[in-house]
Amino acid sequence: EPIGRMGAAGRRRRGLHFVPEERLGRGAVPSLSLATNMLLTRQEALRAFGWIDRAALRDQASGVLRRYWVKAAGPGAVARSLSGGNLQKYIVGRELDAVPKVLVVAQPTWGVDVGAAAQIHAELLRLRDAGAAVLVVSEELEELFALADRLHVIAKGRLSPPLPAADATVERIGEWMSGLWAGGPGRPEAVAGGPA
């Protein structure tokens, strides 16, 4: 079913979740509590006629804080009071805890410590192994090599063919970032059917 014209709520109902690159403003509202920020992407605490079950919301937020080792004063803490790394752990944890069918995650470990990065990687792999589709967008090639089954590169507005992770090297990805794949924008003769 095409989702291009579907609203955010419809996409969420179908199991699509997203971790944006911009933490404050897109991933969390800076002036709202962590509990209230749950409502940006999670609807479990909503009741009939739009009522919010505040206790359920606090419990949900507390669970994310605990499971992802987020250092915060509690679910009532405002988002802007967290360090960048702790806010990242909270946003990623919020989306992972939704058990999405499809997760698009940009820069999943940006600003987090090594231990938290390992936990996030393990959770992303666990979600994938449970049958979800996980699309990771990252500038960290080592992170992509660790998480991906296959890689794509976007260069000059064009999407590369899939590259199995086992065949990926820093050098090859570097070439592809310049559009140098068979049929890529850096090889116009290949697009026309000439030798690559």
Question: Model-flagged regions — what are they?
Answer:
Residues 1-196:
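Glycine-rich phosphate-binding loops of nucleotide-dependent enzymes
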